[in-house]
C-alpha cells in the first residue's frame, strides 16, 4: 500500500502528510529493501549503488552521484568493495549494497521486508545495530517488516502487530511486550 503496488480498500495513503493514494509507485519516493538482495550481478558495487540515481525521474549530477556513493559506502563499510562485482561479495556485503541502494536515494520512507533474515546470527546482530544507527543519523522513516522478535524489540520505536492482514496493536516495544492485545 505504501509503495503503491496495491490499492487500499478504504482510506488514504499519506506520506509526509501528502495524499499519495492516487500516485504511481515511481511518484512516491519510497525505497525498498528485500530479504533477497536483488542486485545486478553484472554490475560493480558502485554501479549498483548509482543505479537508482540514474532514473529519468531523478535529477542528480554525476558529481552528486559520486558524493552520495562515497558517503553511503563509507557508512555501510563497503567503500573498499566499490569496484567488485556483486557476485564477488559475501552475503552480508550484498545486503549492505542492497541497503545502500535505498540510502543513496534519500527517500521519504524506507520499506524493509525481512532484510536480515537470511544472514547468520553474528552478521545479523551487527547489521541490526548498524541499521538502527543509520536510521537515527538520517532521521528518516523506516518501516521494517519482520517475524523476528529480537529485530522488532531492539530496533523499533513503535511496533505494529498484524494478524490476518489487520492491525491489531500499535505501540512502543515496551507497551506491546507488557500489554499484548493478542496471545494467539
Language model feature labels by segment:
Residues 3:
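Helix-to-loop junction immediately C-terminal to a conserved catalytic motif
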Residues 6-7, 54:
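A position-specific signal in ABC ATPase nucleotide-binding domains
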Residues 8-11, 95:
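Intrinsically disordered, low-complexity regions of eukaryotic proteins
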Residues 11-18:
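Conserved ABC transporter NBD signature motif
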Residues 17, 25, 29-36:
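ABC ATPase nucleotide-binding domain signature region
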Residues 29, 39, 44-184:
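ABC ATPase nucleotide-binding domains
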Amino acid at each position: 500500500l505504501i509503495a503503491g503496488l496495491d490499492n487500499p480498500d478504504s482510506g488514504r495513503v499519506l506520506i509526509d502528510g501528502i495524499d499519495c493514494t492516487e500516485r504511481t509507485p515511481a511518484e512516491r519516493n519510497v525505497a525498498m529493501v528485500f530479504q533477497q538482495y536483488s542486485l545486478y550481478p553484472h554490475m560493480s558495487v558502485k554501479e549498483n549503488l548509482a543505479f537508482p540515481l540514474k532514473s529519468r525521474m531523478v535529477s542528480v549530477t554525476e558529481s552528486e552521484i559520486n558524493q552520495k556513493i562515497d558517503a553511503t559506502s563509507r557508512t555501510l563499510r563497503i567503500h573498499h568493495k566499490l569496484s567488485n562485482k556483486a557476485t564477488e561479495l559475501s552475503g552480508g556485503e550484498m545486503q549492505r549494497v542492497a541497503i545502500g541502494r535505498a540510502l543513496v536515494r534519500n527517500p521519504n520512507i524506507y520499506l524493509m521486508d525481512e532484510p536480515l533474515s537470511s544472514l547468520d546470527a553474528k552478521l545479523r546482530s551487527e547489521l541490526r545495530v548498524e541499521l538502527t544507527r543509520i536510521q537515527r543519523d538520517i532521521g528518516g522513516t523506516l518501516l521494517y517488516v519482520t517475524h523476528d522478535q529480537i529485530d522488532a524489540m531492539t530496533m523499533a520505536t513503535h511496533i505494529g502487530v498484524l494478524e490476518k492482514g489487520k492491525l491489531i496493536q500499535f505501540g512502543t516495544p515496551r507497551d506491546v511486550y507488557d500489554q499484548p492485545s493478542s496471545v494467539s
